[in-house]
Amino acid sequence: MTKSNFVDYAKIHIRSGKGGKGSIHFRHEKYIPWGGSDGGNGGKGGDIILRGSRNYWTLLHLKHKYHIFADHGKAGEGKLRHGKDGQNKTIELPIGTAVFDGTTGKFITDIKYDKQEIVLLKGGRGGRGNNYFKSAVNQTPKHSQPGEPYEERQIVFQLKLLADVGLVGFPNTGKSTLLSIVSAAKPKIADYAFTTLEPNLGVVNVHNSYTFVMADIPGIVEGANEGKGLGLRFLRHIERNSLLLFMIPSDANDIANEYKILLNELACYNSELLNKQRILAISKSDMLDTKLEDVIKKELPTDIPHIFISSFTQKGITVLKDLLWEKLRFHDMKEIS
């Protein structure tokens, strides 16, 4: 996904359809000069429906849609003819989309699975025609009902990528390179900060038997929770990852402190992120010998599993994939139990 086609935010004015007006009509048939009422009911207004779809990975298809309106119900007619119902409007959304009220910011719902359907706005009911009000004492009522009004509101859609593993680290720590090595993804890679401007997804194959999805999130900087660097926009994608793989290069000045800064940024954004499983990968470690590794190990945080890796030589890559898979399996077993 590139900057031009990765869209994870959309704000749209939506409106259901109003109900059609009931008809006021009387029979005018030959030889029946005093025919009774035969006004039909109005049609129902169309609903606004949200539907989960695996056919979409981003909100790109909504990028230039500012208004989505369902059709109004048609008015009833004589001879008991019912007005045509307004057509529903269905908005297809990728799995992992959160829905908020665009005015208040209040959370409404989210899309969790394929083909999930949620009626967000209901269309108005059609009004009753005058035939509905006919009685034994009044065969020719001269009134009907208007249709019910439509509903409308501003809605914000925010996509949170669904990935098993999220890569967390400062810019230029080798996250994109790792993703390109363990999957078929082709993220942009260069020797400067903020090469990754949009999230990238890749499917990781483990021993040709199992797969999981890995997400390369743009690099975090100190103060990201306050909007620095690429800011908060991409931190929300970490919320739906089952496991966080922290990546810090072996030549960092203080690995433990960098890890602490990353944790603090996540905690300031959403403290629940600290409840996720974590693994620390020391990247760019192909130039380290055993003695240097032992020195670095003594400086590492003790509350997180760690592994030394190199995407260049593929040192530790197979072991890393196995470790990630085992952690994900353990997470799934806990979810089931």
Swiss-Prot record:
Compartments in which it is found: Cytoplasm
Positions of Mg(2+) binding: 176, 196
Alphabetical list of InterPro entries matching this protein: G_OBG, GTP-bd, GTP-bd_Obg/CgtA, GTP1-OBG_CS, GTP1_OBG_dom, GTP1_OBG_dom_sf, OBG_GTPase, P-loop_NTPase
Keywords: Cytoplasm, GTP-binding, Hydrolase, Magnesium, Metal-binding, Nucleotide-binding
Cofactors demanded by this protein: Mg(2+)
GO biological process: ribosome biogenesis
This protein's record includes keyword ATP-binding: no
Top-level taxon of origin: Bacteria
Annotated Obg domain residues: 4-162
Record GO terms (molecular function): GTP binding; GTPase activity; magnesium ion binding
Family to which the UniProt record says this protein belongs: Belongs to the TRAFAC class OBG-HflX-like GTPase superfamily. OBG GTPase family.
Function statement: An essential GTPase which binds GTP, GDP and possibly (p)ppGpp with moderate affinity, with high nucleotide exchange rates and a fairly low GTP hydrolysis rate. Plays a role in control of the cell cycle, stress response, ribosome biogenesis and in those bacteria that undergo differentiation, in morphogenesis control.
Subunit structure as annotated in this protein's UniProt entry: Monomer.
Protein name as catalogued: GTPase Obg
Organism of origin: Azobacteroides pseudotrichonymphae genomovar. CFP2
Designated gene of the protein: obg
